[in-house]
């Protein structure tokens, strides 16, 4: 289904370039498609200088115009709460302290580094952890800036894993993308290259380009971390994009963010993860929403996340259950969270809660040692 765009020829609809060139970016444009709520209209007006708005025709087509609480709509259309100081005072622009001495480079964990290579996004998601960069304009890192990042990685031989993010890293020109990957592959201690991309969700047409896939395959091993938040985002186009990546030997993992009003429902999450497994995408993380200024209204309680994790157990295969994690403030790293299944302990005896809620006694006898 191509809601709103039924008259667009299929060859154009399948064009990534057409999707980007025809993004809806103004109040006047979006009102052609949606009857905006007062808080949305005011939100678009008041966020433009701070948190700009843009949405691809493809992602817009997934919105049910009759539902003001549509989960795609909530992720893509600004609301005035984003600039409500009373609400957003609990957040920080850079709560995870990503900014360092080298622009765009974050070296938090000893063996891996994050490269933010562009501020451009196909869609400016309203819950984005990097909303602070929205107002910087749409620009990619220059080759000189990339070279500075590469030199840093060369000097730090403990780095074996490079995560390329943004903005949207796979929006880079093919020429610049190949330059970046070729420079990284010159470094012998770099073993893994990952992309954090939401294009399979927002503009899956990007992966209908064989030249892009040729480049990614050429510099294998490449891993894709994508970001489906709701089952409505898994369409035939998204499935085709994932399939094209997998056929090139590029694994695809998913990192979902727990968002109030979007997916803070156990049944919604179960449906999402089941659909991801069906298209061969592994649910890797369920992230608790970060305290980012401009996105605080999307946060739920930790108890809600634990409730969802408890619900998934017994209803979903183990490899389909993501790790629920909190990103600690100040760049202190991720902490995994699990419901407490140990209800009681006495010496070597434990009482565990099963997935059905039954409490079962379990005794650990002496461990034999040779």
From Swiss-Prot:
Cofactor(s), names only, from the UniProt record: [4Fe-4S] cluster; pyridoxal 5'-phosphate
Cofactor detail note: Binds 1 [4Fe-4S] cluster. The cluster is coordinated with 3 cysteines and an exchangeable S-adenosyl-L-methionine.
Modified residues (N6-(pyridoxal phosphate)lysine): 334
Entry GO MF terms: 4 iron, 4 sulfur cluster binding; intramolecular aminotransferase activity; metal ion binding
Sequence positions that bind [4Fe-4S] cluster: 121, 125, 128
Domain Radical SAM core, residue spans: 107-322
Enzyme Commission (EC) number: 5.4.3.-
Record's keyword annotation contains Methyltransferase: no
Record's keyword annotation contains Magnesium: no
Keywords in alphabetical order: 4Fe-4S, Iron, Iron-sulfur, Isomerase, Metal-binding, Pyridoxal phosphate, S-adenosyl-L-methionine
Family designation: Belongs to the radical SAM superfamily. KamA family.
UniProt-listed NCBIfam families: KamA family radical SAM protein
Full protein name: Putative L-lysine 2,3-aminomutase aq_454
Species this protein is from: Aquifex aeolicus (strain VF5)
């Amino acid at each position: 289904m191509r809601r709103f765009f039924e008259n667009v020829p299929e060859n154009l609809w399948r064009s990534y370039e057409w999707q980007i060139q025809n993004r809806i970016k103004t109040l006047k444009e979006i009102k052609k498609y949606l009857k905006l709520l007062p808080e949305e209209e005011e939100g678009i007006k008041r966020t433009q200088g701070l948190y700009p708005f843009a949405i691809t025709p493809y992602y817009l087509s997934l919105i049910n115009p009759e539902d003001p609480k549509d989960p795609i709509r909530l992720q893509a259309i600004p609301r005035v709460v984003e600039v409500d100081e009373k609400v957003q005072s609990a957040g920080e622009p850079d709560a995870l302290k990503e900014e360092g001495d080298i622009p765009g480079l974050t070296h938090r964990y000893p063996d891996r580094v994050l490269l933010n290579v562009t501020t451009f996004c196909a869609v400016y998601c309203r819950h984005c952890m990097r909303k602070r960069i929205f107002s910087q304009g749409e620009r990619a890192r220059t080759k000189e800036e990339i070279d500075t990042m590469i030199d840093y990685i060369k000097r730090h031989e403990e780095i074996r894993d490079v995560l390329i993010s943004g903005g949207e890293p796979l929006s880079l020109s093919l020429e610049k993308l190949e330059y970046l990957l070729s420079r990284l592959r010159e470094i012998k201690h770099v073993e893994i290259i990952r992309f954090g991309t939401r294009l399979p969700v927002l503009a899956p047409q990007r992966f209908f380009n064989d030249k892009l896939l040729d480049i990614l395959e050429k510099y294998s091993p490449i891993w894709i971390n994508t970001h489906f938040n709701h089952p409505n985002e898994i369409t035939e186009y998204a499935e085709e994009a994932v399939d094209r990546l997998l056929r090139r030997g590029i694994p695809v993992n998913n990192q979902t963010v727990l968002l109030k009003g979007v997916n803070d429902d156990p049944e919604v999450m179960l449906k999402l993860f089941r659909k991801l497994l069906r298209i061969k995408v592994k649910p890797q993380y369920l992230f608790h929403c970060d305290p980012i200024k401009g996105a605080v209204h999307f946060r739920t309680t930790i108890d809600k996340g634990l409730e969802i994790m408890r619900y998934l157990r017994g209803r979903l295969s183990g490899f389909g259950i993501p790790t629920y994690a909190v990103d600690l403030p100040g760049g202190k790293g991720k902490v995994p969270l699990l419901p407490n299944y140990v209800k009681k302990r006495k010496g070597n005896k434990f009482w565990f809660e099963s997935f059905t809620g039954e409490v079962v006694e379990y005794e650990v006898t002496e461990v034999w040692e040779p």
